[in-house]
């Protein structure tokens, strides 16, 4: 990951620059998808509530998403597949959907992933009545039918304790499925961290944790509500969420680190857990890039804004990111990040919601893109942010995925009648299918650089400029000859910049990174 930062001497010579065609600006809705890039889907009738919680992309451009359908007190796990145009795939499940019917109680689905052989696993909880929920993974064949060779009747279930247990994230390795869960103390409202691991066939891995699983917290009355988890570069597991402090009635972010065997990371925080008790807020999502961990959610207190923190795997702040490792953005009365991914250039893409707080507040889908240094991408949406409304009600984008065609698909819910599945697809750019090529050829190296930047070009280029991501011009000049030019950048602060070259074919841009 972070390829744009780690690869020295990025060579562009001989490569025809790809320019998006008109209407394909990064951060805009993809008009080739359904109704101008948007889809409201309610295939289970007007009385059903639908809510999409996670999504994966397949190689052919289709997507599969999971969530719940049904009525209050009787929600069922549902998995649906859409073709690249956004239509239900009739060859998947029954008319494009698999629904797990359980008459005992409601079920929940929060996370999904693809196994190496194309099977799909969905993590959540199966209800047995009252407060009895067991951590459950459903496994489907590529055609949307349960895998009879996985666990019992296509399900793996694990009971941590006698209370409510919900899998929040399924993490797939070459041989195992690791589940990150919230585990409640029976009879109490305290949450704890739960980890459990099984094979790709749904068999408990007895060598993980303590006989296959672990429940972990700081003490019996410390509430730790888990919301996400990721594998780290060292094979360990990072989890995040929020701690509810009953003394001041405030949530605070927390992170927990475990080794690959499911044991708390020695020397990290308090038994492998750090609570940011000086920073009110909540983590709902995380992503990793090399040895850097990114945690996202919202601030808490008088304002609730988009928030992302960057840390090293030892818990120290990754200071080159944003403002001393911390990013905040105030767009509306309430702003919340619910999912986070990192693209191949090291940029952060976050989905969530923005608008008026409260159950009936008018909120919109939100899609945010940051450069690797934690500044909003000025070439994306409006100052790095795009919002999309499905109507005058709340629209929450619970998850996103980047497709092989370099498009972002956001899934969630929209409360227009009852809650409906809400899906939107956006252009990220450049678009590989349907591009205009320019014959301008040049190279920029080394990139990143700590001192000088060389520009080699094959034709007459008239002007150049270096701007900050927010558009402030740092340097500018004229190019009066073809060949090569060297710029001294030792006086420019470390960070990401936009290099623009004026050519007979129009302006060409390239991100450059200065690292002193």
Please state what every model-predicted region is.
Residues 427-445, 457:
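Residue-level detector of functionally pivotal "anchor" positions at catalytic/ligand-binding pockets or at interdomain
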Residues 494-516:
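C-terminal tail/sorting-segment detector
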Residues 1-25:
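Bacterial Sec-dependent N-terminal signal peptides
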Residues 476-481:
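Short beta-strand segments within Ig-like beta-sandwich modules, predominantly Fibronectin type-III
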Residues 447-453:
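Short coil/turn motif common to extracellular beta-sandwich-like domains
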Residues 483-487:
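Short strand-edge motifs at loop-to-beta-strand transitions and within beta-strands
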Residues 24-433:
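Extracytoplasmic mature domains of secreted or surface-exposed proteins
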Residues 466-474, 497:
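Short, glycine-anchored, charge-dense loop/turn motifs used at functional sites
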């Amino acid at each position: 990951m972070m390829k744009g930062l780690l690869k020295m001497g990025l060579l562009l010579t001989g490569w025809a620059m790809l320019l998006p065609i008109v209407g394909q600006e990064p951060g805009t809705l993809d008009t080739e998808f359904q109704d101008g890039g948007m889809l409201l889907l309610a295939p289970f009738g007007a009385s059903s509530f639908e809510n999409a919680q996670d999504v994966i992309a397949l190689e052919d451009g289709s997507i599969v998403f999971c969530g719940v359908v049904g009525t209050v007190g009787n929600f069922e796990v549902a998995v649906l597949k859409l073709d690249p145009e956004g239509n239900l795939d009739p060859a998947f499940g029954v008319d494009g959907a698999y629904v797990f019917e359980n008459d005992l109680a409601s079920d929940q689905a929060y996370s999904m992933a693809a196994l190496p052989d194309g099977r799909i696993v969905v993590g959540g909880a199966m209800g047995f009545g009252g407060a009895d929920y067991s951590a459950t993974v459903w496994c489907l064949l590529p055609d949307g039918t349960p895998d009879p060779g996985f666990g019992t009747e296509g399900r793996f279930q694990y009971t941590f304790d006698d209370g409510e247990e919900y899998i929040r994230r399924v993490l797939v390795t070459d041989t195992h499925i690791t589940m990150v869960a919230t585990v409640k103390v029976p009879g109490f409202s305290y949450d704890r961290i739960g980890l459990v691991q099984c094979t790709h066939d749904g068999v408990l891995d007895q060598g993980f944790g303590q006989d296959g699983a672990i429940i972990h917290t700081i003490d019996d009355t410390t509430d730790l509500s888990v919301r996400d988890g990721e594998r780290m570069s060292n094979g360990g597991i990072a989890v995040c969420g929020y701690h509810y402090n009953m003394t001041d009635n405030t949530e605070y972010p927390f992170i927990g680190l475990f080794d690959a065997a499911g044991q708390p990371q020695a020397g990290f925080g308090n038994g492998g857990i750090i609570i940011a008790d000086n920073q009110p807020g909540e983590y709902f999502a995380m992503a990793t890039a090399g040895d850097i961990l990114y945690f996202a959610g919202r601030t808490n207190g008088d304002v609730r804004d988009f928030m992302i923190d960057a840390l090293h795997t030892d818990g120290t702040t990754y200071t080159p990111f944003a403002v001393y490792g911390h990013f905040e953005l105030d767009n509306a009365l309430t702003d919340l990040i619910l999912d986070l991914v990192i693209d191949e250039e090291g940029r952060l893409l976050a989905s969530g919601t923005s608008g008026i707080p409260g159950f009936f507040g008018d909120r919109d889908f939100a899609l945010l893109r940051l450069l690797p240094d934690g500044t909003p991408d000025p070439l994306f949406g409006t100052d790095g942010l795009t919002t999309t409304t499905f109507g005058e009600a709340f629209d929450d984008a619970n998850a996103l995925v980047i497709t092989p065609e370099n498009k972002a698909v956001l899934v969630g819910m929209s409360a227009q009648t009852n809650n409906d599945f809400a899906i939107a697809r956006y252009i990220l750019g450049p678009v590989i299918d349907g591009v205009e090529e320019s014959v301008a050829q040049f190279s920029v190296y080394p990139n990143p650089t700590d001192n000088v930047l060389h520009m080699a070009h094959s034709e007459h280029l008239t002007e150049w400029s270096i701007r900050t991501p927010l558009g402030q011009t740092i340097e500018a000049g004229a190019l009066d000859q073809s060949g090569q030019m060297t710029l001294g950048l030792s006086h420019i602060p470390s960070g990401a910049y936009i290099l623009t070259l004026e050519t007979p074919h129009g302006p060409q841009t390239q991100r450059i990174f200065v690292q002193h």
